[in-house]
């Protein structure tokens, strides 16, 4: 939102019984929750529709890059389009009909809405090494370490696209400290942006080295070598050579065909989006059920939509868990956590969540060559706000103004 001024106050507390830790999108879900709650309160106070109040105060896409009140520069985004897409996807205009139907079944239907912006930067340095092997495979060494994000797939896609080779001929080597000389790790939504960028650079370097070798094989100048559809060809010859051909023909004289590239990026990017949640509360038992969840997430250029959707779904599950279930309870006498294992701890299950209606927006970031933002934390960032606001909306007839988490 176009908030002209901001005042920040921080308080540091030392404790050995923390109730939370740095978590997915750490800090941003809580800030988004506070802002979206305040918008709802303000809208009620001035007698204005909360959705219209949000639209009235959105940052325009024409204002990008936008410097906010605390000095952060939002690189790109179209927040109004996110809102419009999400409300259409969520069948916003037919909510009243669903609410009446729910009431007939003894249910209280509520709806929550949240826009979000989150930041992604992480360790600025990353290195990629690409080597053509004699078994006609490419080995890519990179310093990230996935924990289910599918790096092996999406990283291979980036390299395959630039080098114009089949994706199944690429081997991604991760997490081996005997091989990885430099690596920033996987955190803060940095992996695809930093690794993708440096792998793209290394791929271009590999093509240039291959062109230099191909020029000697084709007996022409480097500028006369064309690379199309995975083949090097002289403009004056019909002979075509693949990367693997060049490696095989020049390995003895020039060594392995390879490229190494190190890169640093210090500018953050700002993934953003909109989330809408609907909940049903049983009017007798007050049992809570999330019935609909809709989200539109601007991740910049999306390399693999299926993986991004998986990241979004997982992030939503974590945010829903924080909003309605999870509580790190501590025994006040011993200081020990009461939940000794996940058997004793309230986390969301598949049955906790409805079918998630998610769409991806792709406003490319100008901060890196591939236009990537991030897709790992966007699901979590608006979840607290949209779930809690939906619950408060459902309980409006009881004049409930606030409710603490976990619900």
Where are these regions (language model features)?
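Conserved beta-alpha junction segments in alpha/beta enzyme cores
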Residues: 110-142, 149
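Short beta->alpha junction loops/turns
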Residues: 28, 144-145
